[in-house]
């Protein structure tokens, strides 16, 4: 309900232009968010995206998956598997759900770690493609560290690993992309697991995982509340929540 009320607070006309921000709805956002009890942020942000931490303190609403549960191929998420890197033998098919260049550029920050709201897309995060399939960041570029939980970037460790069997075989490479000329060079990483994870089931070229999919995390609830507070001119309270 908190999420619903936040959408409803931004009242629109027939052309979808916001014409009013409903303070009563915003207050309801806060009220419903405060009713979420017993939850907390994960001590390590990466735990939210790793097998072994399902239904943790930050998980509010999640699709549940399982393996070795007596079914033919287990109740695993093959949807997630369809998004695994397509161009490496470590995974399977099919390399969908990729980050755009615009999205990746949006992770750029200034020297203080704050987002570049107006200028982030003026320069791409890298502008050199080297022969090894990796690339350095463009000069002077700094990134929000959450990008390394989210997107496979050439030359950076994939899923917190450098190696599975051979040196650097888990360092994301241009060759991992399905069709770089069409889809770009970035990989789907947040919802993937390391290929040696016991959570994986392989059926032909497809891989499924028993890792749950979180639809709502406690972090989302906190941000809904923070947005409502800021819109109600309670900026310091909203910022305190954001900076947790």
Kindly give the residue locations of the regions a language model identified:
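C-terminal substrate/ligand-recognition segments
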Residues: 136-244
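An aromatic- and glycine-enriched ligand-binding surface/loop that stacks and positions planar moieties
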Residues: 3-176
